[in-house]
């Protein structure tokens, strides 16, 4: 006998309807993804989501764009309202998360045409996108219609004053300068909507350049200088074994859930594969960029005189010889 699902309706819907573009099969989330998604999207008895902003930051090739696409699709189906795929430029806004949603619908049209005709607005049956937008049919969505997903580059003035229910900021490490700050400010979650969320996918940025992302990291994730195991944010109940942190009280305005991982958890990403990326002649002399993309660590964009591993090895060797660092907490 099959045990009843413990997933929230939002996670169940994504696994029931969202096709991956590379394999053309329905998504099946890894256990750690499933736990985080259930925590982020399990509404309370009043139907309110626990967090206004969710950050999903992992090393390269950990499925960030696929997660963003599945969530954007699921949002339009379950919560509805106006949804935006946002990015640093037009190509990135249209070719990443938004493009995954389009490909999902193309695969759905082949594999489950009746569902496709049911959920996509009649005017979009033959052509999935029009004017950078996908329109979804009226169903049992929680937010008022119209229900659509639109991709928008960083032109905040063109979309000012909208009624956004959902926004996805893709690769936020690339958001730099005052214009990007104003763009961010325009797309805040709206309390007037029954459900409204801001979702961020990214890996780490550069010190002094990725100001928006650094502000979030510094507030929620950055380790205490005296104890690296202590973060500025608080561990999330039931997720204490994962690098997931909370800022603000759940179900309250301004609340954040931040998943900031340094591990390569996909089973195909063996240590040999990761080291192979490090030994690639094309990245020779750019150790910091390898660490940023494959370890999800903040860097300056400039190379250190000595690699961190060598420094650690020398410190251990010195300690074994009786040398003690009396200022290690300074």
What residues fall within each predicted segment?
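Phosphate/NTP-binding elements of NTP-utilizing enzymes
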Residues: 1-330
């Amino acid at each position: 006998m099959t045990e009843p699902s413990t997933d929230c309706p939002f996670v169940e819907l994504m696994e029931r309807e969202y096709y991956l573009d590379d394999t053309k099969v329905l998504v099946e989330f890894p256990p750690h993804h499933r736990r985080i998604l259930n925590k982020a999207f399990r509404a309370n008895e009043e139907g309110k989501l626990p967090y206004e902003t969710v950050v999903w930051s992992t090393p390269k090739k950990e499925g960030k764009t696929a997660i963003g696409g599945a969530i954007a699709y699921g949002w339009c189906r379950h919560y509805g309202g106006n949804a935006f795929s946002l990015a640093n430029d037009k190509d990135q806004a249209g070719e990443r998360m938004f493009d995954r949603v389009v490909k999902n619908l193309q695969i759905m049209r082949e594999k489950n045409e009746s569902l496709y005709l049911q959920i996509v607005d009649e005017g979009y049956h033959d052509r999935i996108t029009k004017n950078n937008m996908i329109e979804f049919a009226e169903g049992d969505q929680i937010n008022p219609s119209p229900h659509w997903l639109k991709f928008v580059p960083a032109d905040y003035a063109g979309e000012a004053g909208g009624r956004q229910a959902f926004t996805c900021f893709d690769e936020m490490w690339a958001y730099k300068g005052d214009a990007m700050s104003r763009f961010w400010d325009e797309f805040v979650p709206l309390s007037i909507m029954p459900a409204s969320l801001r979702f961020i996918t990214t890996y780490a940025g550069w010190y002094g350049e990725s100001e928006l992302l650094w502000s979030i990291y510094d507030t929620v994730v950055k380790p205490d200088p005296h104890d690296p195991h202590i973060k500025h944010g608080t561990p999330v109940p039931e997720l204490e074994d994962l690098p997931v942190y909370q800022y603000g009280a759940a179900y309250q305005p301004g609340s954040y859930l931040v998943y900031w991982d340094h591990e390569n958890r996909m089973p195909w990403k063996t240590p040999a594969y990761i080291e192979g990326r490090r030994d690639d002649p094309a990245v020779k002399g750019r150790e910091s960029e390898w660490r940023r993309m494959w370890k999800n660590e903040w860097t300056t964009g400039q190379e250190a005189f000595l690699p961190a591993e060598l420094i650690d090895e020398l410190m251990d060797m010195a300690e074994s010889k009786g040398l003690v660092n009396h200022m290690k907490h300074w």
